[in-house]
Structure formats: structure tokens, C-alpha cells
């Protein structure tokens, strides 16, 4: 074909580069972000196969074959064409598979929606069809009215006066990148971009709002020699931009702060993809900080009662995952901002066909990221988005969010009608803000730069000279692009559009502010590849004197760069392939710059509000050059766009953003640890004289005895009377207190466990948690005994306590201990049913061996589906039995005798016939049922518990309620375990992996991501030991025992 000649010329040009480019030292592909390894042939494939069908490629191959010779050149050409042809076929095959996958997903979504709607049988007329505006959170109980929109300074003052009585404590979390309050190194790497600026400015703005006492922005402490020392400072105060109005509210600990929590490698700055194994460590450190700060604020402004966060706000998937765990541990509301979504990224990469799903996951840890986002949807009260596009086209890709079902649920909530255990987070569009107080749009032009003798001007900012030195004619309008050198920012297409449009080149200059660099060789491979491509294009089109690309700029220089472009009557351009929001567009508009922006993503919403420029297809060079030329050449259009931007920019101010943000937060139903309102001071010293009295208070505040120890686990009927429950608790307290008063003094001396202080676990110097998952009862018993025997000395002294953590019920635990000759009093606490129940050893054997902590249930019951969830699970089990059972054999059955109010247990006869745990989680999420599904005991049992319940979260609860130091816990696990196994191996606690125990990994065979993506076995907190001889040595190695 005539149009195919360039293919061979391109191939030959690549071959001329030489074979040395094929090795791993070469720069990565321009078009792929963070690709890793690069070969010229793959680069060619990326450029060709998306635009030519296989007929064209086949003809190129025929051409190569026709000129075959013994020479290496033609052999390589032939092989290359074969590879291209094969990849083109693979691309088509992938497209077919992708179409099938999307069709299957659509059917699953429709089926789930039908089943959910069928359960919710009440009919509504228009309520479930329209997008009803309601400020009730999706959890559903709050009825606070929404505050009116503020459109003037007068109404803002009125709103501020109404908020002065509030003393809110807010926590923001953003984990990756380098975060500091001043001189942010935006563009230094792909992790330090717009999100960093957004979270810092949001924290600063919230800290200046009336009614907000303190804001903490939690991030990672980085003490690496590769970064500035400031990133290793534990705390940094964010100075308000303008605090005169609210200075009277400032207190000792008030304001906004960056708090850096140490986690991960201490002396190494690592990319976000490698942070996943270390997130539990952050959760434990952040939990400790928040509890400490809550108590401090309580002493200052809370009349001695802790001031719990009004909300914890996670940013991006990693922080969202951490925030979900913190929300559960502290029982406070969660917010989420996704910024960039993993499922959307996966869809784009699969659509390109350049990487397999396995390669994508290996590079980006994309499946772990998606699971973090799904968990965040399970837990979040509200998801804040920048644009409507993010909701309609990105969040709807997730199992946990369905816009249609969300509207149905919201309509039911508004009418106080049951949702049958279904919950959906509320999606709220709140565009990011900006501080405009100190921005003065430049009204002059380039002729005014030098000033005159009568009206001297202030010296030009140094960055102006740094940019203008590149230009042979600095008087021309300046087209400004400000983005890091990342393939998705599409800078090379911009340079091509500029270089190929002669009229544009004659009328304007191009300034590319692409982050900071010292040397190209010192940049990341992706960034250096983009920059080298830009430089080659400048040379190709001979753009010397017309394009600026300075090496350095400070964050404080950015406003001056905008002013320079506006002074030259230039244009700001954002040509990104897709832009989640586009904060730089708002900044540019505030400085009087019209915009040309991508039509994909957030710029569409910004343009709708500002009406200050043109939208373009980022893949269309001609469209980009025409839009730029139109704005630069038409002065009337330029002036109109400038004026529109300045007129409408106030709608993106930080006060407006924060007002909407705070109005939403204050509409939430308050959530915080319940016991704190009645028996504060739980974390006092364990030897305090008030301990004995507090024990009785604790019992009266939702601690119930299991009187017979027979395993009657259905102790709290959701339909039952609260008065019955209250009378039983009061009777238990009377019996317990009578028994205590009548005890002889000698009985108190038996051991410290029964010294009258409850629970005994509070007084231990360190805690051993036995979390061995069942391979067989005998093996588990033997390993448990060996662990107990290894610390016999410390056990006798009372310095060590034991917790048994298991998927069994409390009655099964008792039978298990008795069968092995163990006494329940050997343990201080029991975490049962995979973390849905927490029991303590009873102080009085006459009342039964166990006490259940009811406050733990109130702590984990958030979004528990109850009877609606139970019915759905039974329906799922029935459908499975109908499909796969032989001879009427039931594969999965509900075990009523093992189930409790917060754990639905199913027994499994044929584990191989049951879908993987991820499939059941997916099915429930599609129906808006939020829960934690745990496959246990080698797949023979399924426990379905509240979404915020787990064995590791139960340990965090012990820290929150009783002050038990997580760093003083040693969790014993096997080599594998239940599907919640990964949660037990990360965090501040120590982990001992027993060799040869729980070796079967059948439950982990169909994981979405490998365990190595989420567990750091090289951590100093994880050791391996043999249950026969190394247990004590392992505890010494973890520094919990001394010689």
C-alpha cells in the first residue's frame, strides 16, 4: 500500500540505531508511563499497531521477505515484522476478551441490582428514579439541615459566626510523595504532584476556618539522605495565609499541622507501589497519635473528655485503605478522595493492549490498589470528587458503587424506609479550592516590562529572566505548559503541534516548565525519556529560540510564571491524555490566563464554570494548534476569556470549598468510642487505686458474662427488647459484685490475674497472641502448648498475657482447650468468630468462664447488614447447591448453631466447588452489602462478619480501649492460614511464623494479588521459628524477652 512506505523506513531507522539499544539500560518508551524495560521494536509497535490493521503489517512483512539476504540487517527486519504482526493479532484477541469481560460485568451488575431491588419491596413513584438531593449520609440516621450556599463575604461572616462554638478535630491522610508546607518539590517524581499541593492547601485552609480547632495531615516520615531533612521532621505547623479574622480562636494545640508517622524502610524513600506492605505499620502509628491528640485536646477544650476526630479523610487508594482501618479501630467517620483511580487506570492500560494484566499488576500493584479502593467504598460515609466525570465514568467501574442503586437507597433513607442492610457512600462533587487573596492579575503587557523614569517598576522576578533567556523574541505571547515530564501529560504532542504549525510559531513562544532537574541521567527513566523526546523534537523542528525549558524553579516562582505568561498576553495549556481535575487551570485563570485544555476529565467541569478558553482532543495535534492559534491571534477572544476567568474564579476559592466540606461533615451521625462518654480515663496507669472501682463500671457498661459457658452465642437478638438485655446485665453486675465482696482476702493472692482488676490483660508487660489457623486440632493444640511452655516462667510471674485468636466460636474454644488439657484461665482474652466477638476470662468462676465485651459489638457494627445480609447469603448458598451439588448433597449450608448476631457461619462440604473469596465479596458489594468475608479452616467454614471486624482490628480495639501497646504484642501464626492471614503479619506488633504449622495454602491459591505485595517478610518485626525449639529464642530476637 502506498501509505505504508514509512513503516519500512521507520523500521530501518530503528535498526540504524544499533543493537545496543535493545539492552535494559535503554530509556523507556515515551508513550508508556513507568514502563520499565524498553526495546525499539516495542516502541515501534506502540506507534504502529493502533493505527494500522494486520493487512498493512503483513504487506510490510512480505516486503521484508522479498529483500531477504544473509545479512543480519534483513534478518532482524523480518523478525521484527513477525513480532509486530503477532502483537497486532494479540491486540485483536484482547479486544474480544475485553468485550466479553465487560458484557459479563454488565450482567453481574444488572443481576445484583435486580436482587437488591427485589429485597427492597416497597414501591416509590419518582423518588427512586430521580437524583434526590439529601444531606443524610448513606449510613442514614442524621437529619441535620444543609447549610445554604455562600456567595458573598457577608453571608460567609454570618456562617462563620454560627460555627464559632464548634471545636472540630479533623485528620487528613496522604501517604506517598514528599509533603511539606513550603517550597513543595512538585514534579520531582510521579508521586509528588498535584495531590501533594491539594492536601497541604486543604489542611491549611481548614485550619483557618471557624469552628475547626485542629487539623492534622498525616503522612510518611522520610529520613533518607536522598531527600531534604525537612521530610524527616516529626511535626510541621502550616502557617495560615490570612489568620487575622480568626486569631481569637487559636489555642495551645490549635491550627493545621503536618504530622509525619515513621513506617516502612527508615532510611529509604520508596515509590507508592512499594508502600502496601507497610501500611498496617502506619495505621498503628497514626492510631497512637490520634488517641494522644484526642486526649490532649480533651484537656484543653473538651472538659477532660477526649475530642475524637469528626472525620478521617483519606487521599488516594493507599491512604484510603489505611483510613478504613483507622475508622474501624477508632469508630469515627471516614471520607475518601480518590484522586486517581486504579480500576480506571487498569481499563486504559488493558485497552492499549501493550501490557498483559500480569505485567500491569507487577508494575503498578494495581489489584491491591483496587482492593484498597473497594474497601474504602465499603467504609466511607462520603466520597469527595472534583468532577462529575469521576463519578459517572470512573467510580461506577467499582463493585462497591452503582449510581442507580445509590439513588434508590438514598430515596429510601429520605423516607425512613428500611434498606435491608444495604449501604452506599454518598458521592459529592466539591472542586478543589485556591487562595486568591494575594493574587493580583497583571494588567500590563511586555512593553511595560522595562518601566520608565517617571514610573519605575519593581525588579522583575528572577524566574522571568531564566525563562526569557531562551527566546530570540521575548515580546511574543507565551504559551505556557506546567507539568512534570510524564507520558500521560502529553507534552510531546504539544511540542509536535507547535512545531508543525508555522503561523503559531511565528506568533508565539512556548514555555515548558517540566519540574526540576540537575542532570538528565539523574532523572527517573520515564521522566528522562520524555525530556529527551522533547529535546529531539525541538531539534527536529528547529525550535531554538522559540521554546523555553528551564532546569529549575521553586514553588514560590509559579505565580510569577503565570504572571509572565499573562503579561505577554499568552495562553495556558493542559494537553494531558486525561486530567482528573486540573488545579493548574484554576491557578492560571486566577492570574488572568485563558486556557486550552484536554476534553478528558476535570477540565470539562472547570470550563463549564469559568468559560475562559477552549477544550481539545489531546490526541489531535491539529486541534491543539488551531485552538492555541485562535486564542493568540484573536485579541477580542483572548480578552473575553481572560475576563470570564477572573469573574468566575471565586467559585473555586478555599473558603467556599471548606464551607461545603464542613457542612457535609457536620451532617454525619456522630461516631466515636461509646465507653468514653461514661468511664473516661481507661488508659490510666494499671496500678491506679481506681482500677477496682472502674472494673465494676466497665462491667455495667456492656460487659456480659457467659453464665454457663455452653456457647449460647446468640446473646443479643436484634429484634429483642433492650430492657431485657439491660436487666440481665444489671443482674450479672449484682452477682459479680456480691461474689467479689464475699471473697476472702486469701483468694486474692492466688495470682495477679484475679486481683480484682479487670481485665487482667491490661497489666501485662507483653502479650502473646496465638492465631494459629487450623490444619488439624491435634497439631494446633500441640503448637499452642509449646508456646505456653516456652514462657512458663513469665506466665507464673504474671508478666505475660495470652490471647487466643481464632475462627471458632467461644463454645468451640472451650471444647478445644478442655480436650487438650488447657485451662481457659491460661488466657486473658479470646478473639472468636474471625474477630466478630471478644471475650475475657471471667474473674469469678461461679458466674461462668467467659465475659463478652458488648462495647466491642457497638464498635464494629457499622454497616452490618443484619437480616438482609443473611437472606442474601442463604440465597447464594442455595444457588450454589443447585448448580454443583450431586445427589442432593448440600455443598454450603448455614450453620445456625455456630452463627451469632455478628457472624453468619456457613459449613462447606466441598471447598473446591465454592468460588474464591473474592467472588463472594464481589457479589455482596454489587448488592451494596458491606461485610468482611473470611474463608477459614482450609475452606470448610465461611464466616461473614462486619466490614470493620477482623482479628487484627480486635487487637487494635484492645489498644484503643485498654491502652495495650501494639509494639508489646507477639502474634504467632503458621506458614499460611485463613483468608484474613495477611492482616496478622503487618503493623507495629511482632509476628512469629511457626514453620510446619498451617502449611496448606489452598485458600490463597486464587488471590487477586500475591502475598508478597502486602507482606514484608523481611521486616525486623517478623521472625520464623520452629514450634519445637525456637519459640523462646524468637521472642528474645524480637526483644520481648531477655536472658
UniProtKB/Swiss-Prot annotation:
Example of a GO cellular component annotation carried by this entry: plasma membrane
Please give the residue positions where the record annotates the modification Phosphoserine.
121, 125, 152, 155
Q: Briefly describe activity regulation.
A: Activity is regulated by phosphorylation and moderated by concentration of metabolites and light.
Q: Name one Pfam family in it.
A: GT-B_Sucrose_synth
Q: Does the keyword Methyltransferase apply?
A: no
* EC top class named in words: transferase
Tissue note: Expressed in seeds, stems, rosette leaves, flowers and siliques. Highly expressed in maturing nectaries.
Involved pathway(s): Glycan biosynthesis; sucrose biosynthesis; sucrose from D-fructose 6-phosphate and UDP-alpha-D-glucose: step 1/2
Q: What happens when the gene is disrupted?
A: Loss of nectar secretion accompanied by starch accumulation in nectaries.
Composition-biased stretches (Basic and acidic residues): 95-117
- Which residue ranges are recorded for the region named Disordered? 95-127, 670-693
Answer whether the UniProt record assigns the keyword Phosphoprotein to this protein: yes
Record PTM text: Phosphorylated at Ser-152 upon sucrose supply.
Question: Which reaction(s) does the protein catalyse, per the Swiss-Prot or TrEMBL entry?
Answer: beta-D-fructose 6-phosphate + UDP-alpha-D-glucose = sucrose 6(F)-phosphate + UDP + H(+)
GO MF term set:
sucrose-phosphate synthase activity
Induction section of the entry: Circadian-regulated, with the highest expression at the end of the light period and the lowest at the end of the dark period (in 12 hours light/12 hours dark cycle). Induced by cold (at protein level).
Which keywords describe this protein according to UniProt?
Glycosyltransferase, Phosphoprotein, Transferase
Q: Mind listing the GO biological process terms from this record? A: nectar secretion; sucrose biosynthetic process
- Give the Enzyme Commission number: 2.4.1.14
The job of this chain, per UniProt, is described as: Plays a major role in photosynthetic sucrose synthesis by catalyzing the rate-limiting step of sucrose biosynthesis from UDP-glucose and fructose- 6-phosphate. Involved in the regulation of carbon partitioning in the leaves of plants. May regulate the synthesis of sucrose and therefore play a major role as a limiting factor in the export of photoassimilates out of the leaf. Plays a role for sucrose availability that is essential for plant growth and fiber elongation. Required for nectar secretion.
The family annotation for this protein states: Belongs to the glycosyltransferase 1 family.
Q: How does it assemble?
A: Homodimer or homotetramer.
Question: Additional comments on file?
Answer: Plants silencing SPS1 show reduced shoot growth, leaf fresh weight and dry weight, and decreased leaf starch, leaf sugar levels and sucrose export rates. Tobacco plants overexpressing Arabidopsis SPS1 show increased stem height and diameter, increased total dry weight and elevated concentrations of sink sucrose pools.
What NCBIfam families does the annotation carry? sucrsPsyn_pln
Q: What protein name applies here? A: Sucrose-phosphate synthase 1
Please report the organism this UniProt entry assigns to the protein.
Arabidopsis thaliana
- Gene that encodes the chain: SPS1
Amino acid at each position: 500500500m502506498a501509505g505504508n512506505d514509512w513503516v519500512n523506513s521507520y523500521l530501518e531507522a530503528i535498526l540504524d540505531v544499533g543493537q545496543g539499544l535493545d539492552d535494559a539500560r535503554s530509556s523507556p518508551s515515551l508513550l508508556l508511563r513507568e514502563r520499565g524495560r524498553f526495546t525499539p521494536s516495542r516502541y515501534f509497535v506502540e506507534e504502529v499497531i493502533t493505527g494500522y490493521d494486520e493487512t498493512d503489517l503483513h504487506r510490510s512483512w512480505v516486503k521484508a521477505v522479498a529483500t531477504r539476504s544473509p545479512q543480519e540487517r534483513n534478518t532482524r527486519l523480518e523478525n521484527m515484522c513477525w513480532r509486530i504482526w503477532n502483537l497486532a493479532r494479540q491486540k485483536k484477541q484482547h479486544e474480544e476478551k475485553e468485550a466479553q469481560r465487560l458484557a459479563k460485568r454488565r450482567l453481574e451488575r444488572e443481576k445484583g441490582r435486580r436482587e437488591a431491588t427485589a429485597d427492597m419491596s416497597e414501591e416509590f413513584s419518582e423518588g427512586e428514579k430521580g437524583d434526590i438531593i439529601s444531606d443524610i449520609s448513606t449510613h442514614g440516621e442524621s437529619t441535620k439541615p444543609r447549610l445554604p450556599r455562600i456567595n458573598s463575604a457577608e453571608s460567609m461572616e454570618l456562617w462563620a459566626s454560627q460555627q464559632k462554638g464548634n471545636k472540630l478535630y479533623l485528620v487528613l491522610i496522604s501517604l506517598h510523595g514528599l509533603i511539606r508546607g513550603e517550597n513543595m518539590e512538585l514534579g520531582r517524581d510521579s508521586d509528588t504532584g498535584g495531590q501533594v499541593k491539594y492536601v497541604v492547601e486543604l489542611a491549611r485552609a481548614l485550619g483557618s476556618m471557624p469552628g475547626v480547632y485542629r487539623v492534622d495531615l498525616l503522612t510518611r516520615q522520610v529520613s533518607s539522605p536522598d531527600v531534604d531533612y525537612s521530610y524527616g521532621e516529626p511535626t510541621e505547623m502550616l502557617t495560615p495565609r490570612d489568620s487575622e479574622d480568626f486569631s481569637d480562636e487559636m489555642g495551645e494545640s490549635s491550627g493545621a499541622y503536618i504530622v509525619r508517622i515513621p513506617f516502612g524502610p527508615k532510611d529509604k524513600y520508596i515509590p507508592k507501589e512499594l508502600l502496601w506492605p507497610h501500611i498496617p505499620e502506619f495505621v498503628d502509628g497514626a492510631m497512637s497519635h490520634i488517641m494522644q491528640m484526642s486526649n490532649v485536646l480533651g484537656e484543653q477544650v473538651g472538659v477532660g473528655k477526649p475530642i475524637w476526630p469528626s472525620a478521617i479523610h483519606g487521599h488516594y487508594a493507599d491512604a484510603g485503605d489505611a483510613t478504613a482501618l483507622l475508622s474501624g479501630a477508632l469508630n469515627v467517620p471516614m471520607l475518601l478522595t480518590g484522586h486517581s483511580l486504579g480500576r480506571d487506570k487498569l481499563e486504559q492500560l488493558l485497552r492499549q493492549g501493550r501490557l498483559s494484566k500480569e505485567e500491569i499488576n507487577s508494575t503498578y500493584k494495581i489489584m491491591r490498589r483496587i482492593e484498597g479502593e473497594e474497601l474504602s467504598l465499603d467504609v466511607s460515609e462520603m466520597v469527595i470528587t472534583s468532577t462529575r466525570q469521576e463519578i459517572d465514568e470512573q467510580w461506577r467501574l467499582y463493585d462497591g458503587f452503582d449510581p442507580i442503586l445509590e439513588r434508590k437507597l438514598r430515596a429510601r433513607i429520605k423516607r425512613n424506609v428500611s434498606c435491608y442492610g444495604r449501604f452506599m457512600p454518598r458521592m459529592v462533587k466539591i472542586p478543589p479550592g485556591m487562595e486568591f487573596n494575594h493574587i493580583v492579575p497583571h494588567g500590563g503587557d511586555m512593553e511595560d516590562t522595562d518601566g520608565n523614569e517617571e514610573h519605575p517598576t519593581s525588579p522583575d522576578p528572577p524566574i522571568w529572566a531564566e525563562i526569557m533567556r531562551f527566546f530570540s523574541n521575548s515580546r511574543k505571547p507565551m504559551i505556557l505548559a506546567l507539568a512534570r515530564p510524564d507520558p500521560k501529560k502529553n507534552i510531546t504532542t504539544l511540542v509536535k503541534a507547535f512545531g508543525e504549525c508555522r503561523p503559531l510559531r511565528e506568533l508565539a513562544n512556548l514555555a515548558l516548565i517540566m519540574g526540576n532537574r540537575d542532570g538528565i541521567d539523574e532523572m527517573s527513566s520515564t521522566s528522562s525519556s520524555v525530556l529527551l523526546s522533547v529535546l529531539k523534537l525541538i531539534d527536529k523542528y528547529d525550535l531554538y529560540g522559540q521554546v523555553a525549558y528551564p532546569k529549575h524553579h521553586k514553588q514560590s516562582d509559579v505565580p510569577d510564571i503565570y504572571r509572565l505568561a499573562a503579561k505577554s498576553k499568552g495562553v495556558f495549556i493542559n494537553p494531558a491524555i486525561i486530567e482528573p481535575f486540573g488545579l493548574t487551570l484554576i491557578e492560571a485563570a486566577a492570574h488572568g490566563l485563558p486556557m486550552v485544555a484536554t476534553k478528558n476529565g476535570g477540565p470539562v467541569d472547570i470550563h463549564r464554570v469559568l468559560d475562559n478558553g477552549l477544550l481539545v482532543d489531546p490526541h489531535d495535534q491539529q486541534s491543539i494548534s488551531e485552538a492555541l492559534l485562535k486564542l493568540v491571534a484573536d485579541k477580542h477572544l483572548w480578552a473575553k476569556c481572560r475576563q470570564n476567568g477572573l469573574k468566575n474564579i471565586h467559585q473555586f476559592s478555599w473558603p467556599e470549598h471548606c464551607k461545603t466540606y464542613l457542612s457535609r461533615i457536620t451532617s454525619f451521625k456522630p461516631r466515636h468510642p461509646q465507653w468514653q462518654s461514661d468511664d473516661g480515663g481507661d488508659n490510666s496507669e494499671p496500678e491506679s487505686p481506681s482500677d477496682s472501682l472502674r472494673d465494676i463500671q466497665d462491667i455495667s457498661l456492656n460487659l456480659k458474662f457467659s453464665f454457663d459457658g455452653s456457647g449460647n452465642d446468640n446473646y443479643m437478638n436484634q429484634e429483642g427488647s433492650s430492657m431485657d438485655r439491660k436487666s440481665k446485665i444489671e443482674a450479672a453486675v449484682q452477682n459479680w459484685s456480691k461474689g467479689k465482696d464475699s471473697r476472702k482476702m486469701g483468694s486474692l493472692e492466688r495470682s495477679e490475674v484475679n486481683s480484682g482488676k479487670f481485665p487482667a490483660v491490661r497489666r501485662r508487660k507483653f502479650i502473646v497472641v496465638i492465631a494459629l489457623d487450623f490444619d488439624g486440632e491435634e497439631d494446633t493444640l500441640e503448637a499452642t502448648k509449646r508456646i505456653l511452655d516456652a514462657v512458663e516462667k513469665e506466665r507464673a510471674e504474671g508478666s505475660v498475657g495470652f490471647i487466643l485468636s481464632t475462627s471458632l466460636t467461644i463454645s468451640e474454644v472451650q471444647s478445644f482447650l478442655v480436650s487438650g488439657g488447657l485451662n481457659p484461665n491460661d488466657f486473658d482474652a479470646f478473639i472468636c468468630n474471625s474477630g466478630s466477638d471478644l471475650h475475657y476470662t471471667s474473674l469469678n468462676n461461679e458466674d461462668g468462664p467467659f465475659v463478652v465485651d458488648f462495647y466491642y459489638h457497638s464498635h464494629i457494627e457499622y454497616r452490618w447488614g443484619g437480616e438482609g445480609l443473611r437472606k442474601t447469603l442463604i440465597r447464594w448458598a442455595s444457588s450454589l447447591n443447585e448448580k454443583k451439588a450431586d445427589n442432593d448433597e448440600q455443598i454450603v449450608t448455614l450453620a445456625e448453631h455456630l452463627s451469632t448476631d455478628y457472624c453468619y457461619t456457613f459449613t462447606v462440604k466441598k471447598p473446591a466447588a465454592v468460588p474464591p473469596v473474592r467472588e463472594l465479596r464481589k457479589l455482596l458489594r454489587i448488592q451494596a452489602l458491606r461485610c468482611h468475608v473470611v474463608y477459614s479452616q482450609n475452606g470448610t467454614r465461611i464466616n461473614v462478619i462486619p466490614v470493620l471486624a477482623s482479628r487484627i482490628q480486635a487487637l487494635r480495639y484492645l489498644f484503643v480501649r485498654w491502652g495495650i501497646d501494639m509494639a508489646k504484642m507477639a502474634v504467632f501464626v503458621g506458614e499460611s492460614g485463613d483468608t484474613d492471614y495477611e492482616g496478622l503479619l503487618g503493623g507495629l506488633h511482632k509476628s512469629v511464623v511457626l514453620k510446619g504449622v498451617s502449611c496448606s495454602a489452598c485458600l490463597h491459591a486464587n488471590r487477586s494479588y500475591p502475598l508478597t505485595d502486602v507482606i514484608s517478610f523481611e521486616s525486623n518485626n517478623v521472625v520464623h521459628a520452629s514450634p519445637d525449639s525456637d519459640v523462646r529464642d524468637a521472642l528474645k530476637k524480637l526483644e520481648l524477652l531477655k536472658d
